[in-house]
Regions:
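Conserved nucleotide-sensing/catalytic segment adjacent to the nucleotide-binding pocket
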Residues: 42-114
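Gly/Ser/Thr-rich loops at beta-strand to alpha-helix junctions
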Residues: 1, 29-31, 100-102
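Phosphate-binding P-loop
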Residues: 13-20
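Conserved NTP phosphate-binding and transfer environment spanning the P-loop NTPase/kinase superfamily
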Residues: 113-214
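Glycine-rich phosphate-binding P-loop
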Residues: 21-42
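Hydrophobic/aromatic beta-strand patches that form the interior of the parallel beta-sheet core
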Residues: 23-25, 46-48, 93-95, 119-123, ...
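Thiolate-centered catalytic microenvironments shared by cysteine-dependent enzyme domains
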Residues: 1-9
Length: 214
């Protein structure tokens, strides 16, 4: 058990994992890590998209709309099937630098240890572009025409941030959601919550890339 989640690992499925050449993609919230993985995948590169398998974006607001997360056992089954049958361990595999948990499911211990030992590249993006990336990624929240509907569940999620950010900040963010000012809300969440709680990855990256939306 790790982080309150019971892990169901099958040792026979893990042999190929030791041979895998993983490169992590790190960066602050809104730096476009998932977009980079999708671009690499379309270009023919090998990608393990943990957020897609977990149906969660790895943050407090990360639930996929209308899609429940898989069980821990199903998450691991999907993951091991991809590693064992769909990936070539002799070629590079790109993985986002996730936390140990993605929503309610946990990254299996063996893969997590492999990720912690793997090299990474780091993405640096200006705040204005991070706001754009984030609003695009969470477009189902940032809908001014349906602000009342979009803000309904969003208000509940923002309320959960009170214990981390304080009561006043949480109230201010909920008010911005009610008003439909999603650009200001996104910027304040990035600066006042995500950046403050961002855990800097261990070690120096192989390379650092500055990215913009142009």
């Amino acid at each position: 058990m790790r982080n309150g989640v019971t892990l169901v690992e099958d040792p026979e499925r893990l042999d190929s994992l030791d041979q895998c050449k993983i490169i992590l993609v790190s960066g602050s919230t809104g730096s476009g890590k998932s977009l980079l993985l999708e671009t690499l995948e379309k270009a023919g590169e090998q990608v393990i998209h943990l957020e897609r398998l977990a149906k969660h974006k790895g943050s407090t607001l990360g639930n996929y709309p209308g899609e429940p997360q898989p069980s821990q056992k199903m998450f691991e089954s999907l993951l091991w099937h991809q590693i064992q049958f769909q990936l070539d361990p002799s070629q590079v595999i790109w993985v986002e630098n996730e936390s140990a948990k993605v929503g309610k499911v946990a990254v299996p211990n063996r893969l997590w240890k492999k990720m912690c030992q793997s090299p990474r590249i780091h993405m640096v993006v200006q705040l204005e572009d991070r706001v754009k990336f984030t609003m695009s990624d969470y477009s189902y929240f940032c809908d001014k025409e349906n602000a009342a509907n979009s803000a309904g569940s969003l208000e509940d999620l923002l309320g959960r941030l009170e214990k981390h950010a304080g009561k006043q900040k949480s109230k201010d963010w909920i008010q911005l959601a009610k008003e439909g000012d999603f650009e200001k809300l996104t910027k304040e969440l990035i600066v006042g919550y995500y950046d403050l709680n961002y855990k800097k990855p261990r070690g120096d990256p192989l390379a650092t890339y500055e990215v913009n939306c142009d």
